[in-house]
Amino acid sequence: VVVWARNEARGKEMEKKAAAEGLAITFDKVDTSDFEAVTAAAKRVADKFGKIDILINNAGITNDSTLKKMTVEQWQNVIDVNLSGTFYCCKAVLNYMLEAGYGRIVNASSVVGLYGNFGQTNYVATKAGLIGMTKTMARELGRKGITVNAVAPGFIETEMVAKMPENVLDGMRAKVPVGRLGRPEEIAAAYLYLASDEAAYVNGAVLSVDGGMTV
């Protein structure tokens, strides 16, 4: 497993924690919004391991503002990381998967990509765009032994969410039929399934992991 990210300090910390648990995870500092950097990183992975079986695209940022106040820079920055970055990563690994006749690509969308969200025109556009990208790639690559799917998380207990006021968290929970926020490991389980051979006949799907928010 190789993790690409821009934050070297957090990447190295993750690498150490994984090693302490007996997991072989390598961190590589990569800006996924830079196509040349991603292409070079993919080559390093292929050279080291001989192949690339699975790609999970979960790099993402937010830069929220209403349409009236949103700057072009805010718009473009989120597009570059969330949407273009996913395209770049898929493009960079594709030939390795085609050569092997096998691949699993899982893209991180969001429930807001399905129904929108106030003050997030840029972010929602990327998450909705990822759904369209996923379905199109699934049609193109399915016969090549490569499946492409997406996960659409709802409200998840992340470090950022944990800092929110309790009344805000209560409002979030009230919108979820199961009455609680999701856990990171529940999202990870969805990724793991879609990346596995058990999901070989799942292609072009958008798996909502949201406690029923989108029902």
Where do the model's predicted regions map?
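The beta1-alpha1 cofactor-binding region of Rossmann-like NAD(H)/NADP(H)-dependent oxidoreductases
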Residues: 8-9, 29-43, 72, 185-186
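Conserved glycine-rich Rossmann-like NAD(P)H-binding loop of the short-chain dehydrogenase/reductase
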Residues: 1-13
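C-terminal helical subdomain
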Residues: 150, 173-198, 202, 211
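Substrate-binding pocket helix/loop in short-chain dehydrogenase/reductase
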Residues: 66-67, 74-79, 161, 172
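Active-site helix of classical SDR
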Residues: 90, 126, 134
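Short, small/polar-rich loop/turn modules that mediate ligand/substrate recognition or access, typified
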Residues: 142, 147, 202-204
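Residue(s) in the substrate-gating loop at a strand-loop-helix junction
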Residues: 110
